[in-house]
Amino acid sequence: MLEMGRRVMVAGTFDIIHEGHIKMLWSAKSLAGDDGELVVVVARDENVRKYKKREPILEESIRAYIVKNLKPVDRVVLGERDPIESVLKLRPDVIALGYDQWADENWLREELLKRGLNVEIVRLPRFGDSSSSSIVRRVIKLFCSSE
């Protein structure tokens, strides 16, 4: 654990950064406290293919670079093949899950306890109406539809 604050971990694809991502990151940062740390795990390209069943729009190094340069973010790491491995390496005090992330809080808590980690798990609400997929649909509608 950090000296005064807490280490909060957030994980995601962060393919097209939008308002909801920024608000979610600020919310997660507030859980860390003044001297805490927000660590963002950016999904590997192979995990985007595996879990989202699609190609990433931007490659992992670009997504990590963009997230690293967002104000609330203290540190960025690329994820592991097994998402639990990232948690074991980072040893966060808190995992902040997005409203739409696949992980069930109880299952995740139990899996981590089996491995000796007692981590607080928080499910964050949806922030705004933006989503990466809605942005993609809008771009297709505006620029790819034949009229």
Swiss-Prot record:
Look up the domain of life of the source: Archaea
Q: Binding positions for ATP?
A: T13, F14, H18, E19, G20, H21, D100, F127
Name the GO terms of the biological process aspect: FAD biosynthetic process; FMN metabolic process
**GO terms for molecular function, please?**
ATP binding; FMN adenylyltransferase activity
User: What InterPro entries does the annotation carry?
Assistant: Archaeal_FAD_synthase, Cyt_trans-like, FAD_synth_RibL, Rossmann-like_a/b/a_fold
Nucleotide-binding: is it a keyword of this entry? yes
Instruction: Report what the protein is called.
Output: FAD synthase
Question: What organism is listed for this UniProt entry?
Answer: Korarchaeum cryptofilum (strain OPF8)
Taxonomic classification, please? Archaea, Thermoproteota, Candidatus Korarchaeia, Candidatus Korarchaeales, Candidatus Korarchaeaceae
